[in-house]
């Protein structure tokens, strides 16, 4: 509130974040607020065919070739409730196959403050269908995003209006299907529903 009062303009990346900025003022001298969505350079991230040589090389490097890949790519941090998400992932037992015979696997690409907890949980529960992959160079992000058959886009409960998972814009630009676990009224959920 202190910073907002002294600002000429407050920029947010979501409608729910505009509410977060304006609500503490209760209608009194609300700072001028604008929303500008995050974006992605469509010349850097775009859909690639599943037979793309570099997508196949990425899959092979991380043992994802010929598998159905459910991917989480980005910050493995506090705002994403990954400690609960991994418990959901645990319900899909190793060896589970899709209708076309591909094994279902989960890939977590990135790093962050809860990575060690999630890795430990996976080891302790013998979740052999989960793999962890380090952050990719920006130039290689197109291949890793296109390697996922479907992607998680999640936020922890109570984070609406505080955090906006900008990973969605890359997933949309790569035309990847998304499993959204997002609070009602949160910016990315609104975009998905629109």
Q: PLM ranges: what are they?
A:
Residues 38, 69-77, 111, 134-135:
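Conserved donor-binding loops in enzymes that form glycosidic bonds
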Residues 64-80, 86-90:
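Conserved donor-binding/catalytic core segment of Leloir-type glycosyltransferases
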Residues 80, 130, 137-144, 151-172, ...:
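Nucleotide-sugar-dependent
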Residues 94-110, 115-140:
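Nucleotide-activated donor-binding/catalytic signature segment of Leloir-type glycosyltransferases, i.e.
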